[in-house]
Design a protein with these regions (language model features):
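A short, acidic, amphipathic alpha-helical segment used as a generic capping/interface helix at domain edges
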Residues: 87-96
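Active-site-proximal alpha-helix that buttresses catalytic centers in soluble enzyme cores
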Residues: 2-3, 7-79, 83, 90, ...
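Residue-level preference for the first positions of well-ordered beta-strands
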Residues: 3, 101-105, 134
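Domain-level recognition of soluble alpha/beta enzyme cores
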Residues: 121-147, 153-154
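A broadly conserved amphipathic alpha-helix scaffold signal in soluble, globular proteins
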Residues: 93, 114-121, 135
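Glycine-rich phosphate-binding loop signature in dinucleotide/nucleotide-binding domains
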Residues: 41-44, 95-102
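A glycine-rich beta-strand to alpha-helix segment
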Residues: 101-117
Length: 154
């Protein structure tokens, strides 16, 4: 199965709170370019999409959803910037085991996206993600590990 991890698009620097920072126009266009490239690789359907509740992540998903079919979309409070990567990885693994998902997308933030990638790919140093960056991991729920299939950067 494939786990896609995407960092939200570029966001405004200031807002009432970090959670309320909105996407910039550049953030939206870069996210759309990455989504289009992913769909062109043949990955346009997700069994489940997990999205951070923060405005910029929600806006990223809303923008890119035009390129994808999503069976289920869940706003997940655990995938905010300082979410616990091991807990999120356990949750995702359980979802995959129970529902036999083939493609799952996570739209989240630094530093979580890097740490989460390292949870799924053994011996990988947590990578830095550019805004709108996406990684696809070919993941085995039985082996509880995966390998990077591809990266897409804006």
């Amino acid at each position: 199965m494939n786990i896609f991890i995407m960092r939200h698009g570029e966001a405004e620097h200031f807002a009432q709170s970090d959670a309320e920072r909105a996407l910039t126009d550049h953030g939206q266009s870069a996210s759309l370019a990455v989504a289009r490239a992913c769909a062109e690789k043949g990955f346009a359907k997700f069994d489940k999409v997990l999205v951070s509740p923060y405005v910029r992540a929600q806006q990223t998903w809303k923008a890119i959803s035009q390129y994808f079919v999503a069976e289920q979309v869940e706003t997940c409070d655990d995938i905010t910037p300082y979410g616990e990567a091991s807990q999120v990885a356990d949750y995702v693994s359980a979802l995959v085991d129970v529902h036999n998902y083939q493609n799952l997308l996570i739209v989240s933030h630094l530093p979580l996206v890097g740490y989460l990638t390292a949870e799924f790919v053994i011996d990988m140093v947590p990578p830095m993600f550019p805004t709108s960056g996406m990684i696809c991991i070919d993941y085995s729920s039985q082996a509880r590990t995966g390998e990077v299939r591809f990266n897409i950067h804006p």
